[in-house]
Amino acid sequence: TGDLIRLVIKQTIETAKDVYTRTGIAKNPVSVVSLAYRELRDLNIKNDARILIVGAGETNTNLAKYLQKHKFANFVVFNRTESKAQKLAAELKGTAFQLNELANYKEGFDVLITCTSSETPIITKDIYTSLLNGEKGKKVIIDLAVPNDIDRNLVHEFDIKLIAVESLKEQAQQNMVKRGHELEACQEIIEMHIGEFKSIVKERN
């Protein structure tokens, strides 16, 4: 029985490896967080970039931990409830502030990630100008909120690379379709491995 279990595990691992290497099933992320990270990665943002996080909910937490996993380490977290900001900041080894302190933050940033439940834009022209604190150069904003957290007019008035939730969701839907096209190839590989497994078991008996 022990040998059979080991054989099952081995065959399962080989099947999974084949599926991932011989098909494109893993090449097209379908989560907004994964897609947001990929867009940021493709911008060649340095690991010491100053990352400002507005909102400490699940989406921002997941993206922040994704960034931390990929060696980003300079985080500042703002949230309406300070305790939640402190919790996420502690996990990221960053700094926490209440959301109402955002307008007074003068330490600058390179990447702004925002996702709150606000019904109106939080990042207004006045707030954004204050956050820049005179800094020049392109900034990256990842707005994952619905409705949006940033005033979209900012994109026309400032040097901003915007990664918006709408485009990420559209990409996720396209990737879901692409994954669907790969399922037939995956099924063929799985069936092939099942056949091999049955032959091996039959020989052992």
Q: Regions from the language model: what does each represent?
A:
Residues 29-33, 37-68, 72, 76-80:
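Glycine-rich adenosine-cofactor-binding loop
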Residues 80-81, 101:
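Short beta->alpha hinge that forms the Motif I/post-I loop of the SAM-binding pocket
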Residues 1-47:
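Glycine/serine-rich phosphate-binding loop and adjoining beta1-alpha1 elements at the start
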Residues 95-97, 102-127, 133, 137-142, ...:
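Rossmann-like NAD(P)-binding element
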Residues 86-87, 107-109, 170-177:
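Short, charged, surface-exposed secondary-structure boundary motifs
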Residues 71, 91-92, 156-158:
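Short, structured coil segments at secondary-structure junctions
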Residues 42, 129-140, 144-205:
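Adenosine-phosphate binding glycine-rich loop
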Residues 82-83, 146:
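Helix N-cap at the beta1-alpha1 junction of Rossmann-like dinucleotide-binding domains, i.e.
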